[in-house]
Amino acid sequence: LPCPASQNYKLTAQQLDAAMAEHKPKVFLFNNPSNPTGMVYTKEEVEALAEVLVKYPNTWIITDDIYNRMVFDGLGYHNFVHSKPELRDRVIFVDSLSKTYGMPGWRVGFMVGPESVAKALTTLNSNHITNIPEIVTAAAVAALTGPQTVPTDKNIEFQNKRDMVIAAMNAIPGVICPKPQGAFYVFPDISCAFGKA
């Protein structure tokens, strides 16, 4: 579904309801904070989307929460189950240690969801991945059991870098670069350069 700059690159409840009614999808995939825009849905926006999803009980909900601990400017992270606990039986949360703990490329992730889904994914996964390398497993254990200040410290560093990049991008004549609220992406509008090369 299109999520233009005029909507802060976010899906509205009205858009979702119209698409759900028309297409009746089996799965709705939601990314918050957003990749590639870095926009973060507010509690009210998540609640409005959750209200819509309650109306469509035959649709699974997969939430890509990989950047949920990378939120800036004092904003919070909100999800559908917090808003509507009755969605719990059809929400699958996907998360990763890669971004939160600075382990990109090591591909250590996990999911939380209904037991039936977890069992099916375990079977599927066992046929595709033989094991996780021992060093990656050790790093994942250290990340999860070690000091949990790492994500907070990284967020401060990423927020400072974001502010520098945004200032530099917006100093370029004609470039408009909205301030991302999470993740580590910037999504500049460089349409001022279209047709000039």
Where are these regions (language model features)?
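PLP-dependent class I/II
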Residues: 1-197
